[in-house]
Amino acid sequence: MKVTIKNINKEIYVFEVNGDLTVAELKNLISEKHNQTPSWQTLIYSGKILEDKRTLESYNITDSGFIVMMIKKPREAPATTPAPSTTPAPSTTSAPTTTTTAEPTPTTSSTNNTSTTTPTSVPTPTNNTPATPNPTPTTSSTPGSTSTTSPQQSSDFATGTELEATIKNITDMGFARDQVLRALRLTFNNAERAIEYLVSGNIPAANDPEDEEEMEGGGGSGDNPFEALRNHPHFNLLREAISKNPSIIPGILQQLAQTNPALVRQIQENPNEFIRLFQGDGNPGGNPGQFTLQVTQEESEAIQRLQALTGMDKSTVIEAYFACDKNEELTASYLFETADDE
């Protein structure tokens, strides 16, 4: 069978393989031919993330279709600073160090639409472990860092069609729907975190059996459920903070969930109305339909890659990108699935 691979740089790789080839074997083949690390590859076909153990023919891949390949490099672990010691450290220590050697920059050409691929790997900073660990937890004050690793750290605001697409993508990977719904709720609809829960099999029991029904139903009464909350003190603080820096939404929601989980649930279930409230209360004298969103250089590059990959307009890509919690792979999957539906 003919398998066409398309990456975000519009490069196309074509392979002639047997239908019983597994996805993992295809990733290894891509690695051999085009030097792409298999563990960094995410393959998507018809809005589904391909599982390593399944065969290509099980996904009914056609000769005219193509597989989207996303490359996601692992995040670098920040260097750990040893606690100050009152005695000088010996010249030799048994503390392990971890280093990663950068791979050479290869040049490869694809079968069709020949182009050049130059993947590079940045060495991981050395992680020095102190000889005597301090059992007392410490909090770092480094800007941009966070002291929590809770799976509820981020929110993708998925709702309605977007949420159902996310649920379908995950259930298609073989997980039970009720477990998927529970994992998504626990992670504020963050698909990547939810999958981590599902893979580990350690999903905390739901506190409220009606929560999953509320997630599916969309919740909220009236045209805009936030009209009654317009003067709520928590909501006003949230609105002011987000208007200044939208990137702090996940952290604020996590804190707000401790004091007003009902409000957070309404925000998750009604993201469009939530955004319209910002637009309606925008800068005086400005366009009431205009909302300025600040993005980092990395986020801007991801949005541009998604535009080039899908051919969709920038506003559509941005909306999907933030709805998917800035997950580039999930955004690509959602955009392709939306395009197929239309």
UniProtKB/Swiss-Prot annotation:
Domain Ubiquitin-like: residue ranges: 1-76
GO-annotated cellular components: cytosol; nucleoplasm; phagocytic vesicle
Domain UBA: 161-201, 297-338
Biased composition (Low complexity): 77-151
Keyword list, A-Z: Cytoplasm, DNA damage, DNA repair, Nucleus, Repeat, Ubl conjugation pathway
PANTHER family (alphabetical): UV EXCISION REPAIR PROTEIN RAD23
Full protein name: UV excision repair protein RAD23 homolog
Taxonomic placement: Eukaryota, Amoebozoa, Evosea, Eumycetozoa, Dictyostelia
Gene: rcbA
